């Protein structure tokens, strides 16, 4: 029986990648049941034609669109995960272009290991400062086997019923740290966090085949110095019971 996967994409400032991202999602070896696009009102500086690209693109007729005239930020995609039709959910950042076997890769582990899967994995070296192991797991570290971590980002693959745990407690911020919050909430329910294999010689399994896009100038983590927010969210979740692997 084919897994029923709902995909949630975000449209905001990267219209140049959306068409390829949709193509790559639709070409998965385990095809998605549905693809939803959350359209956050982009900044006016983006320009009319680029904003239009976020709604009119190849295969747009195969994508369900939620169009907002306001930028609600990064939280809604996790909120809407409970309302989709699939048994599994995969949320993508708008800079993430998966290999064609990414869903297949995640499905090997999500139930067997009871784990949230992501394409970049971090293990913290401090419970008060945003210091992590280098390299990160995933397309950066190119791990040959599954690696359990504290935090995953860029793509999140999980069982739909786990989405409700995001709201066990309110996240500290609505503009940053949703990935940290979700991982911390899942831990309360015995759900681990992992980065599936990203072998050097098989990019079809990777969660993103163009990882450098995640550090461009419009990336939330790079658009300004977020170290203070990162520090605050980390300390908040640790104070509320989040246990870090190496500490």
Enumerate the language-model features and the residues they cover.
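Short, acidic, metal-binding catalytic loop of nucleotide-sugar glycosyltransferases
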Residues: 23-33
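C-terminal catalytic/acceptor-binding lobe
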Residues: 17-21, 168-247
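N-proximal low-complexity "stem/linker" segments adjacent to membrane-targeting elements
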Residues: 1-24
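The conserved acidic donor/metal-binding loop of glycosyltransferases
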Residues: 93-97
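Glycine-rich, basic loop-to-helix element that forms the pyrophosphate-binding segment
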Residues: 68-83
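Short aromatic/hydrophobic "clamp" motif used to bind/position activated sugar donors
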Residues: 89
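Conserved catalytic core of nucleotide-sugar-dependent glycosyltransferases
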Residues: 81, 99-170
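Cell-envelope/extracellular polymer assembly enzymes that use nucleotide-activated donors
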Residues: 4-6, 34, 181
